[in-house]
Amino acid sequence: PDIALLKTIIQLKHLMNGEVLQAAVKIAKQVADDIKQKLDMTIKRSLTGRLDKNTSSVTKCSANLDFKKTIRRNLKNYDKASNQLILKDIYFSGRVKKHNKKRIIIAIDESGSMLGSVIYSAVMAQIISELPFAEVKLIIFDTSIVDLSDHADDPAQTIMSVQLGGGTDIAKALTYCESLIITPRDTCVIVVTDLYEGGSEAQLMNVSKNIITSGAHLSFLTALDENADPAYDKATGQKLADMGSFVGGLTPDKLGDYIGKIFA
């Protein structure tokens, strides 16, 4: 995927109109589709807990018995004399977890330094929104907030909605995220940001504490891309980590693992 080209489009789209803008939207969609195709199955498998039936499960119980595979693999052991199938090998498939509805709230910082993470976050929101047990709330923010939850399944729309410039008010965005929490223990709040707060740091800490205390899961992703090599405000990050939130950069597949473990 040509991430560099898409970053340039985002930076210059305010100068585009007509056919040029339409072409830019097509490129955004193509890049998003390419990323999704690359990540889709890996992320969904991490999140659903569904194991490939070609892989034997370590949990061997009747609920996990792969009946068809067991019969198929033991046909060679059929005893004609006794008219019985001798089961010499028993096969088990992975467990399929049952889920309550989970709410994933993703807040994306529009800062220019976060462009790569914005692109991957938009695609991740689409992938997660396609899961039957997940409900995605998606916002982008600087000093104002835009709720794109109705477009969580359209990463190109999210990407082309980004408005670079202006300040950053993470506390304000997180306060809005808090208002979207209904069942805390079934909620994960993910803020994709470099943590350079232009608003009130005290409010940021207070709201973070409230979310964690409620039982919801709070994460600050300082990078979400293939490199996961973030530049961020480490002092603020340390304070948030000390109170119990996750702070750090993740690759998309690692984010899938992380969310999967949270709701395991």
Predicted regions located by residue number:
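Acidic/polar low-complexity segments with low predicted structural confidence
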Residues: P1-K101, G249, L255, F263
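Acidic, glycine-rich A-domain
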Residues: T42-I43, K69, F92-I105, G112-A264
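Active-site oxyanion-binding pockets that recognize sulfate/phosphate
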Residues: H14, I108-S111
